[in-house]
């Protein structure tokens, strides 16, 4: 975290306790602005700073891309390996790796040299991408996705920490906003780039190999131009002692909780029935590890309050809780749109990967425009609660209109609906700027991590639940429709993988129309989750304080 200047606050006992905990109460208003002296400037300037920014932000762009790049190549990947039952893991695996590792890596950045930890995470990401690109089977690509996701989480946190350390307090809001914007742009460009590779002679494998090329180009900047940034909390202690400070009990329980719950969601209704004993066992394990994790954090088992994995002290601040919920709702709605708008066009219009991704452009353009407009106007107009309320209302309207889409809905109408949903994304990255204004300067990085946890967990759970809804409903619907028609379970699972399946093209016209009805109805049901996220977004916005940003 950046070296903070003196921070003052009223001497009321309640407020002093909040400051001691790194939190300011809602009544005290936002953290006072850190005044920047005229001689306070960045330690890195000029061309060197420009190159560092390009290299660091390129890593953030790659992280965003890899979150969603499989949205338009999953059909090609599943077709290559003829493994359709594990299709959901292509998207979920990356996000799972990110969520499991984001908490321990966040703590590691507080005690290890930021530069070398960042480079280590980049190397993990590149290694995982290499495994995905060269994967001989579906299991290998799933392992690669989880591995790359773990490294990607470290890349994202590294971006936030590097920006916080290397910029002045006055510059930080702008650069932190850029981190969120570039990540978001990467997420929505992922399907376009993935689709382009999947439809080209390069094949889907280059959707992963491209990461290695960019990493190779930027590596000299990371190694030779990025300054070494040892953390004060880790000074004077050996590598082993710093490792011991990490909350290993919390890390193991967090991993077990997330993995078992995602297995429960992804496998249920697809690999085996929801009531299967294996699925019930996974649910029980997830519940037990969740309770154990909460207890380990509350009682600081084999750790202390300073080093425990989850920053639980932020749960005492209602505004921070509301921002956490808002980040979660926004992340879930974003991933539903990015994954399922192209999927609709692949099925209904027979679009190629690149063409179906191009159909996202109305959503993309308004997403980017509203994020930029919000970042520029929100500090000028003040009361950020109004921006959040408007964003939530448009999220509900956009999701609700997407829910009404049928296989014969006009394309122009769908573009209009996606624009409404894009307008609802205006404040989905704003918490990265609002959150730090609510805490003392020495807790800024932790507040950003807190928001990132909400975003990452929602994307993981949202994507897993959406995949489970789509696959289970489509599978059961097509099984009922095509029963006795001579199609195997593998043929039907292949159809669910996307437009590359020949089953839909071979069906008689009337049967194809009914099959598309089943598929589109399943996609519509996925948007119910986005509607719920938007409704909760509006409710959570009402708990934000009516004060100026």
From Swiss-Prot:
Belongs to the major facilitator superfamily. TCR/Tet family. It is a multi-pass membrane protein. The chain crosses the membrane at residues 50-70, 85-105, 116-136, 146-166, 178-198, 206-226, 252-272, 282-302, 321-341, 360-380, 385-405, 419-439, 460-482, 526-546. It comes from Aspergillus clavatus (strain ATCC 1007 / CBS 513.65 / DSM 816 / NCTC 3887 / NRRL 1 / QM 1276 / 107). Gene3D superfamilies: MFS general substrate transporter like domains. The keyword Ligase does not apply. Residues 1-40 are annotated as: Disordered. SUPFAM superfamilies: MFS general substrate transporter. GO terms for biological process: patulin biosynthetic process. Keywords: Cell membrane, Membrane, Transmembrane, Transmembrane helix, Transport, Vacuole. This is Efflux pump patC. One of its GO terms (molecular function) is transmembrane transporter activity. InterPro entries: MFS, MFS_dom, MFS_trans_sf.
């Amino acid at each position: 975290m950046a070296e903070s200047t003196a921070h003052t606050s009223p001497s009321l006992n309640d407020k002093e306790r909040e400051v001691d905990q790194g939190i300011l109460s809602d009544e005290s208003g936002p953290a006072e602005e850190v005044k920047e002296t005229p001689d306070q400037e960045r330690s890195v300037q000029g061309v060197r700073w420009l190159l560092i920014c390009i290299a660091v932000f390129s890593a953030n762009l790659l992280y965003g891309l890899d979150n969603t790049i499989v949205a338009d190549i999953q059909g090609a990947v599943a077709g290559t390996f003829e493994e359709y039952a594990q299709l959901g893991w292509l998207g979920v695996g990356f996000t799972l790796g990110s969520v499991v590792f984001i908490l321990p890596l966040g703590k590691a950045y507080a005690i290890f040299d930021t530069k070398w930890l960042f480079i280590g995470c980049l190397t993990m990401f590149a290694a995982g991408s290499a495994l995905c690109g060269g994967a001989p089977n579906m299991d290998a690509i799933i392992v690669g996705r989880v591995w790359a996701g773990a490294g990607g989480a470290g890349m994202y946190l590294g971006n936030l920490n590097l920006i916080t350390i290397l910029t002045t307090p006055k510059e930080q809001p702008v650069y932190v906003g850029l981190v969120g914007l570039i990540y978001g742009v990467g997420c929505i460009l992922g399907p376009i780039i993935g689709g382009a590779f999947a439809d080209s002679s390069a094949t889907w494998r280059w959707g992963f190999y491209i990461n290695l090329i960019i990493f190779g180009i930027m590596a000299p900047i990371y190694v030779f131009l990025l300054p070494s940034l040892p953390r004060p909390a880790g000074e004077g202690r050996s590598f082993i002692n710093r490792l011991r400070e990490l909350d290993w009990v919390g890390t193991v329980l967090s991993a077990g909780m997330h993995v078992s719950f995602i297995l429960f969601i992804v496998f249920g209704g697809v690999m085996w029935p929801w009531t299967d004993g294996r699925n019930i066992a996974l649910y029980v394990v997830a519940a037990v590890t969740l309770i154990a994790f909460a207890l380990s954090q509350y009682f600081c088992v084999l750790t202390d309050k300073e080093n425990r994995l989850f920053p639980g002290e932020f749960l005492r601040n209602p505004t921070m809780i509301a921002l956490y919920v808002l980040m979660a709702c926004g992340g879930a709605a974003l991933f539903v749109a990015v994954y399922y708008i192209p999927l609709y066009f692949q099925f209904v219009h027979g679009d190629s990967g690149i063409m179906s991704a191009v159909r996202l452009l109305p959503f993309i353009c308004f997403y980017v425009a509203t994020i930029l407009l919000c970042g520029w106007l929100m500090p000028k107009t003040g009361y950020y609660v109004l921006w959040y309320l408007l964003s939530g209302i448009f999220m509900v309207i956009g999701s609700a209109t997407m829910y009404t889409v049928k296989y014969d809905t006009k394309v122009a109408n769908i573009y209009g609906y996606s624009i409404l949903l894009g307008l609802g994304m205006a404040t989905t990255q704003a918490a990265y700027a609002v959150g730090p204004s609510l805490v003392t300067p020495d807790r800024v990085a932790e507040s950003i991590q807190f928001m990132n946890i909400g975003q990452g967990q929602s994307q993981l759970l949202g994507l897993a639940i959406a995949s489970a809804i789509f696959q289970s409903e489509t599978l059961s619907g097509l099984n009922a429709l095509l029963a006795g028609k001579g199609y195997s379970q593998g043929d039907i699972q292949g159809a669910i993988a996307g437009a590359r399946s020949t089953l839909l093209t071979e069906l008689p016209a009337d049967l194809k129309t009914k099959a598309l009805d089943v598929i589109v109805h399943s996609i519509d049901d996925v948007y119910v989750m986005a509607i719920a996220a938007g409704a909760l977004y509006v409710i959570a916005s009402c708990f934000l304080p009516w004060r100026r940003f």
